[in-house]
Amino acid sequence: MKIKVINPNTTLAMTKGIEHAAKSAARSDTQIVAVSPKMGPASIESYYDEYLSIPGVIEEIKKGEEEGVDAFVIACWGDPGLHAAREVTDKPVVGIAESSVYLASMLAARFSVVTVLPRIKTMLEDLVDSYGMQKRVLNIRTTPMGVLDFERDPEAGIEMLRQEGKRAVEEDNAEAILLGCAGMAEFADSLEKELGVPVIDGVVAGVKFAETIVDLGKKTSKLKTYKYPEKKEYVGALENFGRNQTTTK
Amino acid sequence: MKIKVINPNTTLAMTKGIEHAAKSAARSDTQIVAVSPKMGPASIESYYDEYLSIPGVIEEIKKGEEEGVDAFVIACWGDPGLHAAREVTDKPVVGIAESSVYLASMLAARFSVVTVLPRIKTMLEDLVDSYGMQKRVLNIRTTPMGVLDFERDPEAGIEMLRQEGKRAVEEDNAEAILLGCAGMAEFADSLEKELGVPVIDGVVAGVKFAETIVDLGKKTSKLKTYKYPEKKEYVGALENFGRNQTTTK
Amino acid sequence: MKIKVINPNTTLAMTKGIEHAAKSAARSDTQIVAVSPKMGPASIESYYDEYLSIPGVIEEIKKGEEEGVDAFVIACWGDPGLHAAREVTDKPVVGIAESSVYLASMLAARFSVVTVLPRIKTMLEDLVDSYGMQKRVLNIRTTPMGVLDFERDPEAGIEMLRQEGKRAVEEDNAEAILLGCAGMAEFADSLEKELGVPVIDGVVAGVKFAETIVDLGKKTSKLKTYKYPEKKEYVGALENFGRNQTTTK
Amino acid sequence: MKIKVINPNTTLAMTKGIEHAAKSAARSDTQIVAVSPKMGPASIESYYDEYLSIPGVIEEIKKGEEEGVDAFVIACWGDPGLHAAREVTDKPVVGIAESSVYLASMLAARFSVVTVLPRIKTMLEDLVDSYGMQKRVLNIRTTPMGVLDFERDPEAGIEMLRQEGKRAVEEDNAEAILLGCAGMAEFADSLEKELGVPVIDGVVAGVKFAETIVDLGKKTSKLKTYKYPEKKEYVGALENFGRNQTTTK
Amino acid sequence: MKIKVINPNTTLAMTKGIEHAAKSAARSDTQIVAVSPKMGPASIESYYDEYLSIPGVIEEIKKGEEEGVDAFVIACWGDPGLHAAREVTDKPVVGIAESSVYLASMLAARFSVVTVLPRIKTMLEDLVDSYGMQKRVLNIRTTPMGVLDFERDPEAGIEMLRQEGKRAVEEDNAEAILLGCAGMAEFADSLEKELGVPVIDGVVAGVKFAETIVDLGKKTSKLKTYKYPEKKEYVGALENFGRNQTTTK
Amino acid sequence: MKIKVINPNTTLAMTKGIEHAAKSAARSDTQIVAVSPKMGPASIESYYDEYLSIPGVIEEIKKGEEEGVDAFVIACWGDPGLHAAREVTDKPVVGIAESSVYLASMLAARFSVVTVLPRIKTMLEDLVDSYGMQKRVLNIRTTPMGVLDFERDPEAGIEMLRQEGKRAVEEDNAEAILLGCAGMAEFADSLEKELGVPVIDGVVAGVKFAETIVDLGKKTSKLKTYKYPEKKEYVGALENFGRNQTTTK
C-alpha cells in the first residue's frame, strides 16, 4: 500500500527526518511518500502558521487522490486541516496528535505531552480535549525551543526533552510521554530508555494507524460531516481550490 | 472609530448585505468598512471552505493594521481564523458566532441555532462547545439550503427559517433563536416578531461588541497564546505571509 | 438611554465609586443611575450576604420599570439575583461577572480572577462554571482583604491586587486579569499598565454590554425560564413582593 | 434528636402535609418541628420566589440554633438558601433535592424528575448538575400544574404525576422517579406501586439523611466556604440579619 | 434490621475492625453481620485485586438473600462489584466510597481523599468521577503504606494520615477529609479533632445510609440496568454462579 | 507475532467465530490464538456476567506470558478486566470497545453503537464516556436479542442489526455504526454495503491495533497505575491468583 505522509511545513530537512521515521515504522510492503506542501510556513508555532499550512496540506491530499495513495498521515502535532482533509478524499486520513493520544491511552492511564514554545499550549490543550482526552492528559509541557531549533541543534533538543520528560514523570506522574512535534521522532527511543515509560512519537503512530485502517478496508464516512465539499467558485491565489473538485454536486 | 467587517467569503453581494446590517447597527460615529478577501471560496459550507477562507481573512486583518482600523469583526458563523487573527493584530477581533452566543446567554436561558446545510452541524456543535455553551444550546437546526441559496431566494430563505425557528421554539423549547449564517441579518426582525423570542443576528451583535471593546480601550492580550506570530519564511502562493510581518522577533 | 446600576450592597461610598466608574465608561448620551438597595448587607462576602442582598436588588429592578430605565447592571461579582431580575422585567439585565468573563474571552485565551476573601472561592468557581468558562479561568485568587477593606485602605488594596495579579501572570500564566469585586474599578488602569495584560473591571464591562443590548433593541426572552413571576401572596417583611406585581397571570 | 423541617413557602396547609410526611418517616425518638418562614411567598415557582424565600429560611435556621435543633431539612425541591444555611449554623443542613438525587443514585442507574410548571426546568437542570448528577438524570418532566394546584386538587395531581411518571418510565427509560416538589409526598407510595420503580419523595429522604448525619455526630465544615458569615451592618427590612449574628468576628 | 457488611478482602483481622466500626455506628436494633468472602485477595490495592474480590463479594450478597439480610454494605473504598451486587438482590446495596462522597458533599463544599498506595490514584479518580464528584474532590492523596500496613502498624498509619490530612487542609484547602480505605475507621475521631474539619470514614457512613434506605422501605430498581442477571451456564471454578440464580428468566 | 484473542465468555462456538474474524483481519505472519477462559459465564449481558468473566480473562493473560504471546485482545464489547490485564503483563492489551471507538473517530465525526439487550445500555454509556467519547457517540441502540441469540439465529440477528443500523443512520444521523458485541463480526460487511457508512466490528479493529502496537515495540507503562499487582495471599476458589505471581515485590 502507499501512504502519503504530509509534513505541513515546508522545511524539507524536517520532511526527510519524518520520512525516515515513517519508513522505519512502515511494513516492508508499504510505500511511504513524504512531502511538504508547495506553499506555507517553514514551521508551525502559532494559529497563524497552523491555518496557513492548511491550503498546502489540502493540495497534497487532493494530489494524492491521483497518485494512487491509500491513506494519508498529517505529520504535525496540531493535526492541521484534518477535518477538511477527510472531506476531500474518502481514503483514510489520520493526524499524528490524534494517533498519539489514542495509542498512549492503550498503554498508560495518564500521560503528558512535551512540545515546543509556550504559546502553543492553549492550542494543544483544546486539541486533546477535542479527542476526549482531557482527563488522561496531565500536562502539556512546553520548552523555550521552536520547531526548527530542534532540527538545528538536536543535542540541545534531546537535553530539553530529557529534562521536561523527567519532570513530567516526577512531577506530573506521567505514565507515558508524548512528543508533541513531528520533528522529535529521532529522540523517542533513547528517551524511552532513560525515562522508563513509553515515549510516543506521533509520526510512527500515525503511519501504523494508517496501515491498520487500509488493512481493514475502511474509508472515511461520506454521509454528512465529511461529504465532499460543495462545488463552488474560488478566487485569487486559492483559485485552484474551486477547480476540478471532487464534490458532492 | 473604524470597524472592519470581514465577510470571509468572496460573494460581494453578500458582503453588501452584511455591510448594510453592520451600518444599521453601528453608531453614527462608527465607520464601517465591509470587505471580502481577495482569495477564497464563494461561500463557506464545510471545513474545506472554512480553512481555505482563512488566508484571505488574515490578509484583510493585516491590511487593517495599515488602514487605521480599530477593531475587526469576522462575519461568518464559523468564526474562521479568529484565533490567528488575534495573533496578527493587537486590535480587538470578534467572531459573530462568539458574539451571538454571549449575547444570547444574557437574554435567554436556553437557545437554538438555525443554520444552512446539515453537514456543518458537527462543526457548529464543536464551535459552541469551545465557547462553553454546550448546556445552553439546545439544538443546531440545519436546512436543506446553502449559504448562497439564502441570497438567491430570500423568500424561500425566510420561509425555511420561520419553519425551523418555530420548531426550535415548540420542540426544543428554545427561548431565543440564533441565525447561524452571516447572510441572514435581513430576516431577524420579522422572525423575532413572528416567533415571539429574541432572534439574534451575529453581524449586528459582533459590530456592537467590537464598538464596546474599542470604547473600553481594550486590546488583545499579547502575553502568550495571542503573541504576534514568530517571524519565518513562507513559500509558494502564500509567500507574502512571511513578509513584512509584525512579529515577536 | 437610562441605565440603572445597582450596587447590591448598602455602602453608599462604594456605590459612588461604582457610579464614577460607570459614568466614565458610558457614552455621553447614556444616563447612569447608580443606587444601593433600601435593605440588605453593607458588603457581600458569603452566600448569606449574597442571598440577603437579592430582595433589595429585585426591588430596585421593579422600581426601575417605573423610572423608565432601559437596562440594568447588577454590580457585584457574584451576579446576585440575576436570573430573578430577568423575570421581573423585560429590559436587559446584565451581571458584572458574566460581562467580565465574556469580555475577557474575546481578548485572552486563558485568565484568572483576583478577588476578596478566600471563603468566596467556591462561590465564584461555581459561578464561572455556570457561564461555561471553567476551561478558560485558570484560577480564582483570593486575598485576606474584605470588600470594604478595599474602600477603607485603597493603597493596601492596590498593593494586594498587584501582588496577586503578578502571581496570576507568572504562576497561572493568566493572559488577562479579572477584578472580582465591584469596588476595584479605580485600580484597573494602573494594574493593566504594570502587568502588561488586559485587566478587566466588571462595572465598565457591564455598562457597555447594557448599552449594546439596548442599542440592538433586544429584550429578555419571556417564553419560559424568564417569564414574569406567577402572581401570589407574600407575607411578612417581604409582603410587598406579592403586590402590584407585573406577572404572568 | 430534634429535626427542624423548613417549608420555604408560607402555605401552612402544605407545611402540615410536609410535617405529616416527615413524621411518618422519622424514628420514634426523633422530634420533628415543621415550620414555614414568617416572610416570603405562598409557593415557589420561579427564581423570584426562590430567592425571596431565602431570608425567611435563614431566619428559621438561626432561630433553630436557640431552639436546640440538631439538624435542618430545607423542604423545597430547589434547595433554596442551602449554602447560606450551612454558613449560619454548624448543625447539618440538608436539602430535599440533594437528598433525593443521592438516594436515587443508590437505587437506580438512571432516573427522571417529575415536577410543577415548565418554567422551573432550567432551574432544576442547573441544580442537579451542581450535584454532579447530569448523567444520571434523564429528564426533568414538568406539568401544567403549579405547587398549590397539587394542594388544591390532589386527584388531578396524582393523575398528572401518574401520566408523566409513566412517560418517564416508558420514554426516558427512567429506573426511578423523583417527585420534584415538597408537596407530593402523599402520592409516592401509590405511584411506586403503579409504576414499578422506586418513587422518591425528597422530604422523607431529607429527614432520614438528617437523622443519619446527627447519628454520626457530624457537623458542617467551618473551615472556609461555610464559615459563619462576616459580621456587618444590615439595613432596612432585613436589618435584623446584621444583629446578634453568630459570626466569624 | 439486619445489615451485612462485606469486607471484600479476606483478612479477618481487618473484618473485625470493620465490624467494630459498623456496630459502633449502627442503631441498637440493627444487627450487623460482618464477613469476608470465602475467596479472593488478602487486600485490595490494584485493579487485579479489585476484580478478583468481586466473585467473593457477589457470593456473600447471594447468601445474604437466604440469611434474611435487609441491606448490604460493600466495605472497600473502590466499591468493588457494586453494580453487580445490585443486580443479584433487590435489597439495597451501598458502597463506602459512594456513601462517603455523598455524605461529605452535605457537610463541605470541597474535600480530599487520603488513601493507600499511589498506584490506586487513577482508580479512585475514575470512581469519584463516576459519582459526579469531580469538582468537589480536590485531590486523591496517596501514601507509601499498603492496606495491611495500616493493620500491622497503626501508629505509623495514623501518623501518615495526620501528615497527608494536614497537607490536604493546608495545600488543597480541603474542607473535609475522606479516609479512602475501610481499615481506617479507628483513626477518624482523633484526626477530626486534630485537623478541625470533618473526617469521614466510609464504613460508618455506609452503615447509616443502609439503615436509612431500609427505614424508607426502598429497594433497588429492577426495571433495566439492575434487573436480575440472565439465567445461563457458568463453568469451571465459578460454576456455582450459574446455579440457583435468582434471575429474570 | 502471536496475538491471543480472549473471548471472555465460555461459548466455544462464539470463540470460533471470533477466531475466524481475527484471522481474516490478521497479517499472514501473525499467529492468532483464540480462547475462552476455563471459568465464567456462557455470555456477558450484565455487570454480574462481566465481573465474573474477569478471573478467567486474567488467567488467560497470565498463561499468555508463558505461551510467548506478544499482545492480547479482549474480545467482548465491555472490555472486561482490561485495566487488570494491563497490570499482569507488560505486553500490550487492547479491548475491542476501546479499539472500535478510536478507529471510528478516525473515520466519522459522530457514530452510534448497536448492541444486545437494553439492560447493558448504562454499562456501555459509562464505558464510552471513560474513553472520552461522550460527544461522538450519539446513541447506544439495544435490541431484544441476547448475545447467544445472535449465534443461534444469525438471520434474525442480521435483520435486527439492519433495522437498528438504519434507524441509527436516519434518526441519530450516525456517520458510522459500531457493532457492540464480539459475535457480530460476520454481519459487518453486508451491513456496511447496505447502510452506506462504515460498520465497525471490534474484533478485527482490536487485532489490527494489537499488531500495530507490537510493530511499534511498545509495552504497557509499568510506572504507576499498571504496575504488576502487589504480591499477596489469595484464598478459596481463586487461591491460584496469589501464586506464582509476576509482581512488584
UniProtKB/Swiss-Prot annotation, chains A, B, C, D, E, F:
It comes from the Bacteria. One of its GO terms (biological process) is amino acid biosynthetic process. Coiled coil: none annotated. Optimum temperature is 45 degrees Celsius. Keywords: Amino-acid biosynthesis, Isomerase, Plasmid. Strongly inhibited by Cu(2+) and Zn(2+). Slightly stimulated by the addition of Mn(2+) or Co(2+), but also by metal-chelating agents such as EDTA or EGTA, indicating that the enzyme is not a metalloenzyme. The record marks 76 as: Seems to be responsible for recognition and proton retrieval of D-isomers. Its EC number is 5.1.99.5. The record marks 181 as: Seems to be responsible for L-isomers recognition and racemization. Optimum pH is 9.5. One of its GO terms (molecular function) is hydantoin racemase activity. It catalyses: a D-5-monosubstituted hydantoin = a L-5-monosubstituted hydantoin; D-5-[2-(methylsulfanyl)ethyl]hydantoin = L-5-[2-(methysulfanyl)ethyl]hydantoin; D-5-benzylhydantoin = L-5-benzylhydantoin; D-5-isopropylhydantoin = L-5-isopropylhydantoin. It is an enzyme of class 5 (isomerase). Homohexamer. Belongs to the HyuE racemase family. Involved in the asymmetric conversion of racemic 5-substituted hydantoins to the corresponding L-amino acids. Catalyzes the racemization via enolization of D- and L-5-monosubstituted hydantoins. Is able to racemize 5-substituted hydantoins having aromatic or aliphatic substituents such as 5-(2-methylthioethyl)hydantoin, 5-isopropylhydantoin, 5-isobutylhydantoin and 5-benzylhydantoin. This is Hydantoin racemase. It comes from Pseudomonas sp. (strain NS671). The lineage of its organism: Bacteria, Pseudomonadati, Pseudomonadota.
